Design a protein with these regions (language model features):
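Hydrophobic ligand-binding cavity/cleft-lining segments
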Residues: 1-43
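Intrinsic-disorder/low-complexity, polar/charged segments enriched in Ser/Thr/Lys/Arg/Asp/Glu/Gln
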Residues: 7-13, 20, 44, 56, ...
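Short beta-edge strand/loop motif at the mouth of beta-sheet-based domains
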Residues: 11-12, 31-68
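Hydrophobic/aromatic beta-strand elements that line small-molecule binding cavities or substrate pockets
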Residues: 12-14, 46-49, 71-77, 100-108
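A short, structured loop/turn motif at beta-sheet edges
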Residues: 20-21, 50-52, 76-83, 105-114
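Hydrophobic pocket/interface hotspot
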Residues: 23, 33, 57, 75, ...
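Helix-adjacent hinge/juxtasegments
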Residues: 58-80, 84-86
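Beta-strand/loop substructures that line and gate deep hydrophobic ligand-binding cavities in soluble
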Residues: 85-87, 91-138
């Protein structure tokens, strides 16, 4: 390991003009998730998708012609329309880049849904990975707003 471990917590929130059931379904459906979850200049492809407690997703992401990053997601807790807790390991070839504990909290509001995303991350390649996770998640949430038809 060349870099020191770098720990961070990233918290992002969005209010969507859609009920929790609709927002949750966008996470539960891997085909839908693939359409909005990659940042605008990147692509994402699922090789495996098993959205259930104990289930795993295996995905590749990166520039559209170079999906060099590999992610493995393990779902630990899924409370429909309310909460998802999962871990994610991201690697580049044989090198592990980061491990993250992710919590998605779907809170009903008068306007629709307040989605709070908390990512507790350890980067094995320095603080740039934290910046990448934050900008990637921010881009995904913005894309989800466009996909759902708006956010507040």
């Amino acid at each position: 390991m060349k870099e020191k471990l770098h720990h961070a917590t990233v918290i992002l929130e969005r209010v969507y003009e859609a009920p929790p059931e609709r927002v949750f379904s966008e996470f539960a459906n891997p085909q839908a998730r693939a359409r909005w979850s990659a940042p605008s200049n990147d692509a994402l492809a699922y090789d495996e998708a098993d959205f259930r407690e104990g289930g795993h997703d295996v995905f590749r992401c990166g520039p559209p012609n170079d999906l060099r990053f590999r992610g493995v997601t393990t779902y630990h807790t899924i409370t429909p329309n309310r909460c998802v807790v999962f871990t994610e390991t991201l690697s580049d070839g044989s090198a592990r880049l980061a491990i993250a504990l992710n919590t998605l909290d779907f809170e009903p509001t008068a306007q629709g849904t307040n989605l709070k995303v908390t990512v507790q991350l350890v980067s094995f390649v320095g603080p740039g990975m934290v910046e990448g996770y934050e900008s990637g998640n921010r881009g995904a949430l913005d894309s989800l707003a466009r996909h759902l038809g708006g956010s507040i």
